[in-house]
Amino acid sequence: MNIHKSYFYYNAKKDDSEIETAIRSKANDCFDGFWKIFHRLRNDGHVWNHKRVYRVYKELKLNKRVPLRKRLPARVKNPLITPSHENITWSMDFVTDVLQCNRKFRVLNIIDDFDRVIVGQKVAPSMPAERVIRFLEEIIWEKGKPNNIRCDNGPEFISHKFQDWCKGNDIKIMYTQPGCPTQNSYIERFNGSYRIAVLDAYIFRTLDEVREITEKWIEYYNNERPHDALNNKAPMQYRLAKTG
């Protein structure tokens, strides 16, 4: 009777409970895929092999998520020159959505091109040039003034009030060419991530609900969410590593 000797040995199953707990803690507060979660675990100091983490990830059925809405085809993005430090160039753009009652609202997103930190975000029913200027003044008072602002040719940004304000504050406006969103691809990419994680993921009844969820997600985005272009560091982690 030939019986392989491995029959007499018990192969203990690895205890993956710690990995399960860690994955759940990252997956429950966002809509990230596997690699974002994996790099967040690495940034927290965990050194588990990615194959083992992915096996647990699949066992938890986190790879079975259904998209909330059909996504548009990916746009071709031209590379931009990344500034050498913060507050050289900010990029800004609007995102528009509706509340449950079909009331429209706008979100002004402002990003630092150096490290993709969101320096400001404003949720409002409308954002004329005057409100954009007031919001920029609030941010500059707290975070300092950029040398340049990159934006499209929206009516708020081409208004005489906005142009005069920028000129008076020695800020150069870097307008993108009409129909060329790739020239502002840093903020375009952020807008896409924000829409998937927040605007498409929730049904909002009030603007206060939009602000509450947005503020929570921006805190996560700036301080925890790994970014492909930042060596899989979160924007503030990258800034601290570069500037000390």
Where do the language-model regions lie?
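Mobile genetic element proteins and their domesticated derivatives, centered on retroelements
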Residues: 1, 8, 23, 37, ...
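Acidic/histidine-rich, metal-coordinating catalytic segments
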Residues: 143-159, 231-234
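Basic, flexible linker segments flanking DNA-binding modules
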Residues: 2-89, 180, 234-242
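C-terminal domain-tail junction helix/linker
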Residues: 167-171, 193-244
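Short hydrophobic alpha-helix segments
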Residues: 121-122
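Mobile-element integrase/transposase regions
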Residues: 47-111, 117, 130-138, 142, ...
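RNase H-like polynucleotidyl transferase catalytic core
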Residues: 66-69, 150-153, 168-186, 203-207
